[in-house]
């Protein structure tokens, strides 16, 4: 074979926010939700106000522009309050909608709580700002941002980099109006951080990802709503992440897990995506870069990320597919150029292939009726013609696996990449050997919820066979061609295997444990 292989407005924000607040108020104030996590309301302090989520504000807090009225510019007061802020400070923003005209940068804060009076009660308008980020937290530990909304940031809403312990809750990032390419990129944006807790947030209108966690470890993303972003929720090059009880609606892609090349943290893994609702994610993709390749109409997309478990989700009404599982070879098919273009990042463990992805017990309905987007266009055309394994036009598979990386590994065509892998990554199991049982992509016990007879059966698609013995279509040079295999999802033949369950993510925030082994131990989703 040659080295080069070619592959031919459902809710208003008020309604959403009200739902989030109601969900949060039933937690009995237990630590890790709205109890003592942020340090306010301790015994001996006088409570002077409460946010709409029930967080208590004491008289000892630092109050920013307390006499401000709607439309006032509070930039200077906010900057002064957060400059060299004391440890464990609670900084309170006023009620109303206010303008901020520059990026607010906070360096190395410890134990800081920045709070408004509610997700709809305190709104900061950055439409006239001269900085890229609305808020940027650099370094520090034990930082909480809560009960406020950041609107119209020039680039990113709330960015936190190199923070150990970051909690964003009851917070909104919004670009009003239609989803457009000149909207800001990221809404809620923790990066290169540890112990990341994202809950009860709302993200709307990002031209990249509404809720994004990148190059981080120990992550819980729960009870959030992402609407009309390019990517609703994205976990990128991150390890030990639980994404559960979220709603992704009206985005281009609902929930994404990516490993991209060239980043400081070369790869992630152990990502669990469960008990989410991903429906109607059919917005036009106005994004740039790799996220701009996400096909509109994608419920979930797993791109070059190994160690992912997707289960007990409801994935419905997405025009292209419910779940697409793809190697990076769909993005860049030129294998011969990989050593030159990606050799350094491959040495650190990044791989264009993906392994150990397990989908089970998901409820899937009404997906694949109108596939769009360049990334899957040739594949969609094949399934929609007579060129697939059934020989007649088919609805695009609800679960689609490209299979090409696994096939090339199994025939030995990627074996030369082993020489690129550094010692540390190799010791962590990164390799290009033929797949063994623990590497397989598996899908079973998923539920066909299509209302018969109006819709066809939900199907599983395998673009390339993964067993070299099953290759029947090759080009003149002996390269395998897409076989476009398709099978029913229930009682399926393709991808019919199982994998061990992944470990829960654990967030340690201010010496309290969050997630399915901590404050959510009794949560129904955590027992699935």
Describe the role of every protein-language-model region.
Residues 36-79, 97:
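Right-handed parallel beta-helix/beta-solenoid
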